[in-house]
């Protein structure tokens, strides 16, 4: 097992693992992970997020689909760290989402904690459960499936 103190990834390392960039990079830091098992990361939600201009004026709430995307990105990091695959050659595609539940709104100033646990891995498919928390309270949850594919096949 990896010592959690050794498993912290900062934004520079995350940029080397995910193809996402502003404004769609939704993971700021990884605080713990165990390859093939789980990951804990977070996204600092600020009023400067472009989506708050229209969602919703006067009552800014993070869109649920972006909470799911943040969970999927954390899950993507877990997949990368669970394989020997060269990241530059691969894409991780969100292929399915089940049992989505939004429990609590996410507002500017919140620290969105992203927890993903690997459920199953078969060939190119990875299935995991994701949960997003704010202040220790469940904000959203889902079961997600992703496929790993070669960039050249796209």
UniProtKB/Swiss-Prot annotation:
What the entry lists under HAMAP family is as follows: FabZ (MF_00406)
Q: What class of enzyme is it?
A: lyase
- State the function annotated in the UniProt record: Involved in unsaturated fatty acids biosynthesis. Catalyzes the dehydration of short chain beta-hydroxyacyl-ACPs and long chain saturated and unsaturated beta-hydroxyacyl-ACPs.
**Pfam families xrefs:** FabA
**Which locations, inside or outside the cell, does it occupy?**
Cytoplasm
Q: Which organism is it from?
A: Nitratidesulfovibrio vulgaris (strain ATCC 29579 / DSM 644 / CCUG 34227 / NCIMB 8303 / VKM B-1760 / Hildenborough) (Desulfovibrio vulgaris)
Q: What's this protein's name?
A: 3-hydroxyacyl-[acyl-carrier-protein] dehydratase FabZ
GO MF term set = (3R)-hydroxyacyl-[acyl-carrier-protein] dehydratase activity
Which keywords, in A-to-Z order, does the entry hold? Cytoplasm, Lipid A biosynthesis, Lipid biosynthesis, Lipid metabolism, Lyase
* Origin organism lineage: Bacteria, Pseudomonadati, Thermodesulfobacteriota, Desulfovibrionia, Desulfovibrionales
User: Which NCBIfam families did the record assign?
Assistant: fabZ, PRK00006.1
Which residues are catalytic?
55
* Domain of life of the native organism: Bacteria
Give the catalytic activity.
a (3R)-hydroxyacyl-[ACP] = a (2E)-enoyl-[ACP] + H2O
A GO BP entry is: fatty acid biosynthetic process
Record's GO cellular component terms: cytoplasm; membrane
Similarity comment text for this entry? Belongs to the thioester dehydratase family. FabZ subfamily.
EC number, as in UniProt: 4.2.1.59
Q: Where are the transmembrane segments?
A: none
């Amino acid at each position: 097992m990896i010592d959690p103190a050794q498993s912290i990834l900062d934004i520079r390392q995350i940029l080397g693992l995910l193809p996402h960039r502003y404004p769609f990079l939704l993971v700021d830091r990884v605080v713990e992970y165990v390859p093939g098992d789980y990951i804990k990361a977070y996204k600092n939600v600020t009023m400067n997020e472009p989506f708050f201009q229209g969602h919703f004026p006067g009552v800014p709430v993070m869109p649920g689909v972006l909470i799911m995307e943040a969970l999927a990105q954390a899950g993507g990091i877990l997949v990368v760290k669970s394989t020997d695959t060269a990241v530059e050659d691969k894409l991780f595609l969100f292929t399915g989402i089940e049992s989505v539940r939004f429990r609590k709104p996410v507002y500017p100033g919140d620290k969105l904690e992203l927890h993903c646990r690997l459920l199953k891995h078969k060939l190119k498919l990875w299935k995991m459960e994701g949960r997003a928390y704010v202040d220790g309270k469940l904000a959203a949850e889902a079961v997600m499936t992703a496929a790993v594919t070669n960039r050249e096949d796209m």
